């Protein structure tokens, strides 16, 4: 079976914003992520923000609603088409482009903020992606991210449970070899001039098997998640860095 199979995003692009679509679960994560991001930026008004790996536009529209000047890029042309149409229908002026994280089509020192969520574990070249994010950030600009740790527990939950058993996410969409340990990402960012790094656990699942079951049942009943932003980075983690 193919790993890191990103064809799923093309296949679901047309239904991206449908509340019953499986991909729509990602939209529920934005308020949770921004609980953390807002600790570091309290006013998004007029900031120039790039979403790398924007998909059909969940995070872009969330930030645009806060008054930011938003740009989105994704390697799925189908997702970009959907994102443009949905933004237009909701009167959002968002600049969407087809492209790759490893070769961002923007000038140096363009953005106040770069957001990259649910993406770093999928890119073809993580080192080049981080270098490009640094390049397009203005001095003092913020990089916000989340991704999946490379641990036995993360593979158990993300692959065995969510892909294989519950089939809540498509089989093969992740390659556990591409999951990223926090220390690896921190070293990579610092080597590329991204400092003032902070990493926190983005804990959607709890610490025990019963916590995992309860979180899943809550999601099936309500369509939503509860999150703890803490020191438990064993499955997912969230963080920030600054270009200095």
Task: Annotate each language-model stretch with its function.
Residues 1-17:
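N-terminal, positively charged/glycine-rich alpha-helical extensions of SAM-dependent methyltransferases
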Residues 27-47:
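Conserved alpha-helix/loop element of class I SAM-dependent methyltransferases that forms part
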Residues 50, 57-103:
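Class I SAM-dependent methyltransferase SAM/SAH-binding core
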Residues 90, 187, 191, 196-244:
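A C-terminal cap/extension of S-adenosyl-L-methionine-dependent methyltransferases
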Residues 102-113:
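A short acidic, Gly/Pro-enriched loop at the edge of an enzyme's catalytic core
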Residues 127-139:
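A short glycine-rich, Lys/Arg-flanked "PGG" loop and its adjoining helix->strand segment in the class I
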Residues 144-167:
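Conserved class I S-adenosyl-L-methionine
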Residues 147, 167-184:
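Acceptor-substrate binding/catalytic loop of class I
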């Amino acid at each position: 079976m193919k790993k890191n199979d990103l064809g799923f995003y093309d296949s679901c692009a047309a239904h991206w914003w449908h509340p019953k679509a499986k991909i729509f679960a990602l939209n529920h994560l934005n308020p949770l992520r921004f609980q953390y991001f807002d600790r570091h930026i309290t006013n998004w008004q007029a900031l120039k923000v790039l979403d790398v790996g924007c998909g059909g536009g969940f995070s872009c529209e969330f930030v645009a609603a806060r008054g930011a000047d938003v740009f989105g890029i994704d390697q799925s042309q189908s997702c970009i088409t959907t994102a443009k149409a949905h933004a237009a229908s909701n009167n959002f002026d968002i600049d969407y482009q087809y492209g790759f994280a490893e070769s961002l089509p923007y000038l140096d020192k363009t953005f106040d903020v770069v957001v990259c969520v649910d993406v770093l574990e999928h890119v073809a070249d993580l080192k080049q992606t981080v270098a490009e994010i640094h390049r397009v950030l203005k001095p003092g600009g913020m990089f916000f991210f989340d991704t999946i740790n490379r641990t036995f527990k993360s593979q158990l939950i993300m692959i065995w449970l969510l892909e294989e058993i519950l089939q809540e996410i498509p089989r093969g969409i992740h390659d556990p070899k591409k999951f990223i340990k926090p220390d690896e990402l921190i070293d990579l960012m610092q080597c590329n001039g991204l400092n003032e790094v902070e990493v926190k656990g983005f804990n959607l699942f709890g610490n025990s098997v019963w916590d995992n079951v309860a979180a899943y049942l809550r999601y099936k009943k309500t369509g939503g998640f509860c999150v703890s932003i803490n020191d438990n980075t064993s499955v997912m983690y969230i963080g920030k860095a600054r270009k200095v």
